[in-house]
């Protein structure tokens, strides 16, 4: 399996809790990609604990909101992991910053694999949390994995739909979809010629005055000291 270069110092965008213990862990999915995660355990906990795997939002890293969710749930008595999806953050996989519903659904199932074999986890009490664009991935995983006993989708956004139809279905027409395919195909040609891959996504910068409120909310988190992280595509894309 791929050897990862993991940062050992605390580099989250939120303060470290004195109620939990934290460590870096790794696990692999069925595609052979090694994933990096932060594990949060209630301090002083004994016996087998309920566990939760957390990931998202789309384009974010575990040092941002997913880690905050994981740490908070650990304060409430759960053993938790917040993980970087395949191709993202400290996790493995190339080319970087690829999103795939199949692989990213598998990432959640792989997180359940990992949690299921931990000595201090009750394998009959494992849940998952998917945030924003990862809410859909969490629901996908829960639909196929009977080991997942509880699922929460927080502020879920359907990334497959927005990719196909645009925000607010603004590109939901035969002509718009054809033009999008033409642009993507032309970009493939250019990528092959240049030997690099063009990145899409991220948060618009500078922020237009007429941007929708949800885009302003994205900007206020990912592009400011409140939520900026150097490994996050949302912060740097």
Predicted segments, located by residue:
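The serine-hydrolase catalytic nucleophile loop
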Residues: 59-71, 85
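N-terminal cap/lid segment of alpha/beta-hydrolase-fold proteins
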Residues: 2-47
């Amino acid at each position: 399996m791929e050897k990862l270069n993991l940062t050992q110092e605390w580099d989250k965008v939120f303060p470290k809790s004195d109620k939990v213990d934290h460590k870096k862990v790794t696990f692999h999915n069925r595609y052979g990609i090694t994933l990096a995660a932060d594990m949060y355990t209630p301090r002083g906990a004994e016996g087998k604990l309920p566990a939760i795997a957390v990931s998202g939002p789309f384009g974010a890293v575990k040092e941002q909101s997913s880690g905050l969710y994981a740490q908070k749930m650990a304060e409430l008595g759960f053993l938790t992991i917040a993980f970087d999806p395949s191709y993202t953050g400290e996790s493995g996989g190339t080319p970087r910053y690829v999103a795939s519903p199949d692989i990213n659904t598998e990432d959640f199932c792989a997180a359940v694999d990992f949690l299921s074999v931990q000595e201090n986890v009750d394998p009959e009490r494992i849940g998952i949390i998917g945030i924003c664009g990862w809410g859909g991935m969490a629901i996908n995983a829960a639909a196929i994995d009977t080991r997942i006993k509880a699922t929460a989708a927080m502020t879920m956004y359907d990334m497959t739909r927005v990719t196909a139809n645009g925000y607010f279905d603004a590109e939901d027409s035969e002509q718009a979809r054809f033009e999008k395919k033409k642009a993507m195909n032309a970009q493939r040609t250019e990528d092959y010629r240049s030997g690099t891959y063009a990145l899409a996504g991220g948060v618009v910068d500078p922020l237009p005055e007429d941007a929708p409120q949800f885009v302003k909310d994205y900007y206020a988190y990912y592009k400011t000291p409140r939520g900026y992280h150097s490994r996050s595509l949302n912060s740097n894309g």
